[in-house]
Amino acid sequence: MAAPNQVNNNVIYFNAAAQTLLTIRFRIKAIVWVSSEGAGLDIAADDDMLLSDGEGNKIVGKRAEAAGQGLELALPGGLDVMGLTATTLDGGVLYVIGEAL
């Protein structure tokens, strides 16, 4: 499995399914799933997104009901996880924002 792009200690960027980062402890503060037209990674109707922790436990998932319908989810208290996997990412890009622990 390929690794996602870790932009810095605060942002992890997934642009394909099955990208895994198992060796990081991370406090998730926000999750953003958006289209990236320039990269040809648009969200289409019925596209699915599923983010899991390193043990395969579901963190969040969503099915787009219309084209371009992503997700912006804030977790004010944060959610501590060990490892991250974009289990399903049919379209768009996924940003996981928080801090490495």
Regions found by a protein language model. Give the residues of each.
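Surface-exposed, low-hydrophobicity beta-strand/loop segments enriched in small/polar/acidic residues
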Residues: M1-L101
